[in-house]
């Protein structure tokens, strides 16, 4: 090589001088060829990747041109260099070959760079990481030649002037190109710039600067956050996961079958049952739940296992592999620093060492820590994004599974439990994925630590290793116990959330009956168990952490003791001690993290089991539902038998039924006859026993309990279909919605609350019907859609929509109905009884047969009178009038005084005119509605007052208020906080003492000139060192245990306050707040306060005191370091402050964007039969994926913000290491080896601690947001006090007299009055019927009596007491209501009747007897203890309503309110309820709100409401003779006098 350069290639003597240098030949060959070799080796792979990308997006940009121009300049410089070499080669002097080869190599290299840059610009448009690495390598290798040439020039050597100038210019160009490579092309895309960021920008996360700057200037909004790349979106992830999951799940199912065969267990043993909201109601009661409970616990053990983790690994193996490589590289570099520390101590101790050696060590130490930081942060980015994508995949997969889950499988999961899978379990998997590599990395680090410690201390290390081995089984036992507790705690969380879901769903019933304390006690009882388990969990976890924190200290004490005791020649000097201490510090991290990761894996394994069971459950089996295109029947049942549960008898038995296309078929039957089950079977919601159903065409479905989405009325009706104005107007007119839309603020753009909370029952049903009518389906399945509407509205809807001349005429219509007066108009009637068809045929055929139908018809006619006989008039003018508003008294002609024939004819003419004016009014409403819709679309910013119901979730901005920290610390307890801090301070005082004592111990050897000191001195050193180490552990244990108890009390306090306040919130709060949003507080936020926040606070305190103690020790050893610490501290704090605003707001956005995911899921599950019937699963899935992606982009941005900060703060830590090393080199003559070891061993530790402090600071502020969100709901305005000092007499109300004095009320302050000056007197024991069209204010009147709505003026006086002056529970506890929607809660029947256990069993059985349920309940195996499923879904609507009657009979208050209680039941159940009320409440005041006029014709008085005012009030006889609005309504119902109806 000497001949190649014509100079010396290598000379070791050049390094043995104060001014060492490398030979120029070495610099011009090896250091030139290293970067060029790197480029040429990787170039083929790079070009192949570019070729494979196949995307042609070439664009000439300034950056591209600038880089190409500078490379061309380098090309020109290489050409000049070559030409100069050729010019110099005159033959007289020998030109060394290096002069030719290097320019030629550079010429080829720069040409290759030009090609690569051009190709990347065409195809990838992202700077190459390997080109950036090439420029960095080239500059690093060139720096040696750079300084050699400068030295030569300084020595006046002009022989190389030309070459030197060319080199300097070339070096400058390379620096410029590297700087240009750090920038990326600007993009107009809404996606994060990470996809197009340069290599340097990627590793430093500089592409995120703009977001941090934006977040610092003003609080970030969702629009400010970059969108995520397509491959990270839910649709892309689930698509890939689904493919892999299907294969692995199939294998797992096969393995399950093999297991079952081996254990000789029958697969039929699995327990299933009814699902939630099956077709919204069931006429079948599933018996013997108790029998199946035992089976269920056994069955849940048998499900496909061990497939989820495999499927996730196969889905994300590329990212896992990349993060593995980065972590491996980081771990290897981690062990270079102890060796460099050893060399640096040796350098300081050696007085003859050259200064440049020390500087090299300092630079190497800085370089190693810097590269470590880059590797670590890139590794973290990969892992956290992996965790995010795993969570997204799980959430999206759970949602997707919910759309296809079979009813038998779905029954095992309540909405609350499934939301838990999406929120808690997916989060557990995300957490464990973030740190999954630590499982092998910790083992590797422990192994390498032991290896290097062996090199330092020899076999003595085995004593320490032995101790670690002994502690492994202890940790294993603790970990097993932790898992068991975790499993139990997850069950407790599920139970608590299940009850919370029910409470929030039935909050109105709780308020009506003043049952909040009972349900609060139930939640608190579960919460108590949950906190007890949480305490045990935290105690075991603390002991585990204590053992692992103490392990490195004990290991170092034992190792050093054994080392100095086994051989008197073994001297503990600074090099051995502090190199070992640095290795022990490295060992501390894996030993601390390994149990935490194992604990996370254990927790995640519980979640994996739960997810495997759910995702592995059976899907709907639709094989028995055959959809055909060419068939002469619309629907055909062929020997069809279906069941809700395979363990029970078939609900639908051997049904044979043919329905022709275009037919209107009515399905009738008594309660529990199987009407809704027949429909559910058609929809594929039931299990097939045998036979099949053939269906031709698409289906539209109207459920018995209307399912309404949270959105506008228009959105609900369109239901994803395109808007056709003419069709839309026809539908809303036909469904009698025009008057309602006129009254609603915003018209059809008015927002409907969750589950249609701000609509009346009738309005909900009509919106549900309009949704189906708007769809262009072939078959319409209508499950009693007319039950909740007024008689005249029902007739209008039948004529305009369902009947022979309605919008759906010509379509196949299957109508389940209790309104028998429509039956003469249908094509065929199907009579069901006990799941079989008793009779079928036309109305006339069945009447002629004189069978079951004819017999029941006559029975009902006796009870219902002319209303039942009324046929539907097809006169179009009258139909138009039916949907009009009730005419006011002024509209009735003055001469209508008597009911003579002449007057009747006159009235008919008046009615005809009224109908025509009603028709005109309908048209004017239609036009006004159009205007409203257009205005709403064109001027979205001008929101009509009251149009917006659901409030947008409030997002706090700016720094978390100090009051929130105080709120939490107050809950923790100030004394507890003081003692926790004291113990942490004592822990670190002991830590500093340990380091100082070790420093003094190592200095003994230097004082003794390398010989061993006296045994007594040695023993004292060992004893004190060990005592200080143990003291550290004891103080840490004390602080941790104290914090556990304190934080548990904080959790208990916050949950109690939250629950209490939510239960005391007024109904207006629940009207405007989605359930999912409230549940999120009880699920995610409470979980954070329980688990995450206490751990984060403990970690923050450890990190904070760790850094303070380290800096104190460094400053004690080298006081001059204070000068460096000040600017570095300012930089550290400023960067953190700069960042924290962004991180904090992103966490808030994360929390806010989570709620819609869960709300949408709850909404989807409750409306699954409708969604599946309309085949809209894909649309709902896309909507869910969109909401998940919105949340994802906040999470991704937050993850990146952490990396952005960490890389900058680690740079601060690395500078501390560099400055410490540099100062030690500069002041080496005044320092000893133990001081150097003492300073640097702590400085090396600070980088990691600084990083953790930043993360913990961010985590504390992030997690304290949970307290902020909980506090937001703790401070929600309460309704009036439950109990006040002014208590009514014990027997109040004694008479039941009710007096309304100019009573006014509105739903919310910004809305208009709904009751406008109601004044009337209701006497004791009077029976008052309240009538009026939908929206007239009937239900509002009920709400006022119970003070669900508070007065806006006037008063209500009951028995001489103003109800506003007493407590709510004193009022509500003395009144009784049978509500419109019969809501039951999960629990036994007894609890549903008497949650406070106030009544004896005898009283309850009597109430059941009077409610006509005694024989039914007595027939149940568990009787009163029979379990009711969530929402009472294992009871039919009729049975639920009878149970509500039982509640009323049991309470037997002096005042009873029936709020349209019989609207959704058949006439038989209606008759039963009316009979009981008439007999049992004869001495009570009864207010009945009814649609069926015959139910109130025996009332003492009737109140007619319209637009919030009383338009008529008097006895039925008076009102009929007045020929006012009530007379018109009675006329429509076929009732002309009180005598015509009998009840």
Curated annotation (Swiss-Prot):
Q: What general EC class does the enzyme of this chain belong to?
A: translocase
Q: Where is the composition biased (Low complexity)?
A: 908-917
Q: Give the SUPFAM superfamilies listed for this entry.
A: ABC transporter transmembrane region, P-loop containing nucleoside triphosphate hydrolases
Organs and tissues of expression:
Expressed in liver.
Give the catalytic activity.
an S-substituted glutathione(in) + ATP + H2O = an S-substituted glutathione(out) + ADP + phosphate + H(+); taurolithocholate 3-sulfate(in) + ATP + H2O = taurolithocholate 3-sulfate(out) + ADP + phosphate + H(+); ATP + H2O + xenobioticSide 1 = ADP + phosphate + xenobioticSide 2; leukotriene C4(in) + ATP + H2O = leukotriene C4(out) + ADP + phosphate + H(+)
Main location class:
membrane
Residues that bear Phosphoserine: 279, 281, 876, 924, 928, 1436
Question: Domain ABC transporter, which positions?
Answer: 635-859, 1298-1532
Residue ranges in the Cytoplasmic topological domain are: 48-67, 114-125, 186-311, 380-435, 481-542, 607-969, 1053-1095, 1139-1209, 1254-1543
Question: Which residues are noted as glycosylation sites?
Answer: 6, 11, 160, 1009
- Where do the TM regions start and end? 27-47, 68-88, 93-113, 126-146, 165-185, 312-332, 359-379, 436-456, 460-480, 543-563, 586-606, 970-990, 1032-1052, 1096-1116, 1118-1138, 1210-1230, 1233-1253
Detail which positions bind ATP 2. 1332-1339
* Free-text disruption phenotype from the record: These mice are healthy and show no phenotypic abnormalities. Mice display hyperbilirubinemia and reduced levels of biliary GSH.
As recorded in UniProt, its EC number(s) are 7.6.2.-, 7.6.2.2, 7.6.2.3
Keywords (A to Z) from UniProt: ATP-binding, Cell membrane, Glycoprotein, Lipid transport, Membrane, Nucleotide-binding, Phosphoprotein, Repeat, Translocase, Transmembrane, Transmembrane helix, Transport
Domain of life per record: Eukaryota
Q: How does it sit in the membrane?
A: Multi-pass membrane protein
State what this protein does: ATP-dependent transporter of the ATP-binding cassette (ABC) family that binds and hydrolyzes ATP to enable active transport of various substrates including many drugs, toxicants and endogenous compound across cell membranes. Transports a wide variety of conjugated organic anions such as sulfate-, glucuronide- and glutathione (GSH)-conjugates of endo- and xenobiotics substrates. Mediates hepatobiliary excretion of mono- and bis-glucuronidated bilirubin molecules and therefore play an important role in bilirubin detoxification.
What's the protein name?
Answer: ATP-binding cassette sub-family C member 2
Q: State the species of origin.
A: Mus musculus (Mouse)
Q: Which gene encodes it?
A: Abcc2
